[in-house]
Design a protein with these regions (language model features):
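Conserved Class I S-adenosyl-L-methionine-dependent methyltransferase catalytic core
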Residues: 1-80
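Class I SAM-dependent methyltransferase SAM/SAH-binding core
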Residues: 106-145
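The AdoMet/dcAdoMet-binding core of the Class I SAM-like
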Residues: 1-14, 111-119, 123-124, 160
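A short acidic, Gly/Pro-enriched loop at the edge of an enzyme's catalytic core
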Residues: 160-168
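Conserved class I S-adenosyl-L-methionine
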Residues: 80-91
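Conserved SAM-binding strand-loop segment of SAM-dependent methyltransferases
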Residues: 148-156
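Short, solvent-exposed loop/turn segments at secondary-structure junctions
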Residues: 44, 91-93, 114-118, 158
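Conserved SAM-binding loop of SAM-dependent methyltransferases across substrates and taxa
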Residues: 93-103
Length: 168
């Protein structure tokens, strides 16, 4: 893991930034270039990144880029179609953020521990202030239509509220 940190010396951070830029180019051999050029990490959460070619890069965003590229290349999803993505155990929503940027019309469902749902709701609201986000506290009916939302954030005990065969 290549860390850019306040705890490191300037020389160590410069060395790590150079390694991260090299890793970016190494990823270009296995990641769809359209996806690689699209990604940039969020400023929400005050994470440490390098600015390279106008993109905010860190190790995590490059890993998510690889995942998005693999999904894009192995699933027959139309980029502009409305479909439903579910990320179980997706943490604060970093990967879902990339998926939503690429598949703009999708509904993204995050199933996570209740404590982490709080972080995810903050992160996704900061990144998508104009998108409709359904929080688990707003789910009061088993027959809610989650496809009317851009994001649905729910704890794992509410996964039973997802209808069978509703995830693409």
């Amino acid at each position: 893991n290549i860390a850019i940190s306040k705890k490191n010396s300037n020389i160590t951070n410069m060395f790590n930034a150079t390694l991260l830029a090299c890793l970016y180019h190494k990823y270009s051999e296995v990641v769809d270039l359209q996806v690689l050029r699209l990604v940039s990490d969020s400023i929400a959460g005050n994470n440490r990144c390098i600015n390279y070619r106008g993109q905010r890069l860190n190790h995590r965003i490059l890993r998510y880029t690889y995942y998005l590229s693999q999904l894009k290349n192995n699933l027959n999803f139309n980029k502009d179609a409305k479909f439903i993505i579910c990320d179980i155990g997706g943490g604060y929503g970093g990967l879902l953020r990339l998926l939503k940027h690429y598949y703009k019309n999708s509904c993204c469902i995050l199933v996570e521990l209740p404590e982490t749902c709080l972080l995810a709701s903050y992160f996704l609201k900061k990144n998508f202030p104009n998108k409709k986000i359904l929080l688990h506290s707003d789910i009061n009916d088993e027959n809610f239509n989650f496809s009317n939302y851009d994001f649905v954030i729910m704890p794992q005990h509410q996964i039973e509220n997802l209808p069978d065969k509703s995830i693409d």
